[in-house]
Amino acid sequence: MKVSLPAFEKAKVLVVGDVMLDRYWVGPTGRISPEAPVPVVKINQVEDRPGGAANVALNIATLGGQVQLAGLVGEDDTAKALTLGVQALGVEPQWLKIADKPTITKLRVLSRNQQLIRLDFEESFDKQDSARLLKQSEALLDSVDVVVLSDYAKGAIDKPQDFIALARAKGVKVLVDPKGSDFSRYHGASLITPNMSEFEAVVGAVTSEADLLEKARGLLNKHQFDAILVTRSEKGMTLVTANAPELHIPTVAREVYDVTGAGDTVISALATSLAAGAELPQACAIANTAAGVVVGKLGTSTVSRIELIEALALHHGESGFGVVSEDQLAYALEQAKLRGERVVMTNGCFDILHAGHVSYLKQAKALGDRLIVAVNDDASVKRLKGEGRPVNQVDRRMAVLAGLAAVDWVVPFSEDTPQRIIARLLPDLLVKGGDYKIEDIAGGAEVIAAGGQVQVLGFEDGISTTAIIQNIMAKQ
């Protein structure tokens, strides 16, 4: 997906929540234990990674953001290992140390890239510990633009309503990765990011898309949230806000190896993007892409800016793009505009695709973020070009166009001109190749009336479908 990244280095974020150490024991399995019907793992690798709220902070730091981290830890060696882990990426933690509690540890045993078992070492922190942590964190609010509350229901985030209210009063956005069935604890938050299971634990089973939207808007009104982003695994994400249409973002993950930390990645990318000045739809698209990267890795992982740029480029051609119907395109276009993308549209027969076409389409795409190509169907090509045309049927012409890197959507139309479909879609920019006058371009008046632009691009001299056909026939 083509989404421009904001200046992450300008982002100032505070992460408060349940920190933990993710510990991995890794090795091969070659036999079954004689003591019980379980595999024997010969450990040859041990690795510690910051997890929970600490993983959120590391994700923000890896993207280039400035981050402060506050959490509860014990006075133990695990806390020391966790401190070293976050300091390695330049994060200086603000721990509140609790003498009689252990630092939370999740130990995973893996073999052949598969998790065999997880062992948890933890005790929930007391309510007064959470109150002290949140009070300590209030002093950091004046130095940040966004706060993330990373709640794993381990006791760090007990009753954060006063903290949320204070942050909002200071103009600081508050993002919450929620836990449990009581979202009233996060009353007044800017955005919450439940996964589908967490969402249904609060609102009940979701029976349809309309039901999801209705229940999400009910939560918005009840708890005074600005927005809810429901993460939906293979169905992507759905953003619901009070005063705008919903935004559905399809998943971008190609292979899923491990979902550990995917929720952390979503909220960290959201927080970094918003703190850097991105609008919410753009931030959601960035977060969705980041999540698609991290689930392709093993264990708790972070996503770098370079990985994110590469993933955004690779996302072209994913679900929702390519050859589409007019209705599908109308919906996709609505979603693109909600993400703040500039949409360019052109049209033509494209009977035999040649170098001139490719050059022209690259020029058109360079003028925006998305390119629509409307293609004359076979009957309209025959009316325009005469007997013997088209050489290639419309489905083949569209398939070739959809394979070009410059093209996002290809849609057929049956009229002699694309005026009707252009008037329906109303792109930000309508382009046409050749020596047309702007006032003569079909659909141009409608685009201009809607606040868009019309532009004429030049074709490469000496290259045309007609000339290619004549050259082929001359050689027969």
UniProtKB/Swiss-Prot annotation:
Write down the superkingdom of origin: Bacteria
The UniProt annotation puts the region (Ribokinase) at: 1-319
Query: Which InterPro entries does the annotation name?
Result: Bifunc_HldE, Carboh/pur_kinase_PfkB_CS, Cyt_trans-like, PfkB_dom, RfaE_dom_I, RfaE_dom_II, Ribokinase-like, Rossmann-like_a/b/a_fold
Q: What is its EC number?
A: 2.7.1.167, 2.7.7.70
Keyword Cytoplasm assigned: no
One cellular-component annotation, GO: cytosol
Annotated protein name in UniProt = Bifunctional protein HldE
Function of the protein: Catalyzes the ADP transfer from ATP to D-glycero-beta-D-manno-heptose 1-phosphate, yielding ADP-D-glycero-beta-D-manno-heptose.
**Quaternary structure (record):** Homodimer.
Originating gene? hldE
Enumerate the residues binding ATP.
Answer: N195, M196, S197, E198
GO:BP terms for this protein? ADP-L-glycero-beta-D-manno-heptose biosynthetic process
List the Gene3D superfamilies hit by this protein, alphabetically: 3.40.1190.20, HUPs (3.40.50.620)
Q: Which PROSITE patterns match?
A: PFKB_KINASES_1, PFKB_KINASES_2
For this protein, the record's Pfam families field holds: CTP_transf_like, PfkB
Top-level EC class: transferase
Kindly tell me the pathway this chain contributes to: Nucleotide-sugar biosynthesis; ADP-L-glycero-beta-D-manno-heptose biosynthesis; ADP-L-glycero-beta-D-manno-heptose from D-glycero-beta-D-manno-heptose 7-phosphate: step 1/4; Nucleotide-sugar biosynthesis; ADP-L-glycero-beta-D-manno-heptose biosynthesis; ADP-L-glycero-beta-D-manno-heptose from D-glycero-beta-D-manno-heptose 7-phosphate: step 3/4
The terms under GO molecular function for this entry are:
ATP binding; heptose 7-phosphate kinase activity; heptose-1-phosphate adenylyltransferase activity; phosphotransferase activity, alcohol group as acceptor
